[in-house]
């Protein structure tokens, strides 16, 4: 099935990007990362998995809120480092995230199924695929784990927690998380290779 036909079958995200997000689309990333082209996912087929995750929530409401709005803090609270020191990484994660989201323009689960209410959060002002929280979480986790190898498991656990929470909230599909994780790890490794290695030498 062609991309055009899939897009017709799965109506895209309906919303307006903020000026900040539009600005990121024009920005040039510091690191060159060759993001592969992914198959366009099927919204309807993934709705049951989203509903199941929402029903069997693993996180308490307070934890869910923290993963939604304070995800970065969860990583830097684990290590002796400051978020500001990773501004280039975070900016690139944001740039690549919005590029991919606009490229696929996938509708959010609540836009596809009337069984899912629109969540009360400001973190759904972009298309669904891939998950920006997953991209950022795994990108940061990979970079920090390189510098703090003794914290690797804890950092990766937080990345999984943040990513899973997005599906449990009903704002993402499982494939959003899966691909977001893959992209985040790619960017994190590029940062290690191109930035952290230079700093170490």
Predicted segments, located by residue:
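Extracellular cell-wall/glycan-interacting regions and their flexible linkers
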Residues: 1
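Short, flexible loop/turn segments with low-complexity composition
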Residues: 196-201
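Hydrophobic alpha-helical bundle signature of multipass membrane enzymes
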Residues: 4-169, 186, 190, 195
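A structural-propensity feature for long, helix-poor, extended segments
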Residues: 169-179
